[in-house]
Amino acid sequence: HMKADPYANYAELRPGTASRITNIENLKWTDSSWMTAREKWNHKKEPMSVYEVHMGSWKRHPGTEDEGFYTYREFAKEITKYMKDMGYTHVEIMGIAEHPFDGSWGYQVTGYYAPTSRYGTPEDFAWMINYLHRNGIGVIMDWVPAHFPKDEHGLAEFDGTATYEYADPRKGEHPDWGTKIFDLGKNEVRNFLIANALFWVEHFH
């Protein structure tokens, strides 16, 4: 079975599984004021109120139960209004990396370096971050380095062997979720995950 690129920044819309070529090096950022203020912000002294939200279920377009997702851009406008009305300072977005199964809420990731294409392109994702930052709203990402699904196009048995996961199923299988568990004893796996955390901060602010 063909594997998706573990470092791809964009993926086909499910049920497609292929990686797509895109360039995220030239994303247009307009949140310089926010970024400057964030450097001086003291989270130990400043008030902080976090609203956790799953984009796919928070709000949908009427009459479209199965799909009807708001795009990154639509969501940014809607959530900003709500956040300002309610007095929240930060939004924590659940499970935003690419994942094949809607029901996992983004917690069974196949594309660790790609914002999910359910809601738009990487450019649209950056637009959302820009919009929220310009409106004074901080963005927290729910990062999911614990386990990953067995989908054939994903990380499981990537080269035919236990590449990212433990080879011993007693360690490498998550009994509750039926997923694979990262082998953090491997330098390559630790590097993959640490680089991934840095990637989101550096590329998407």
Ranges and model annotations:
Residues 1-52, 57-65, 74:
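The feature marks proteins involved in alpha-glucan
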Residues 38-45, 54-205:
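Substrate-binding/active-site clefts of carbohydrate-active enzymes
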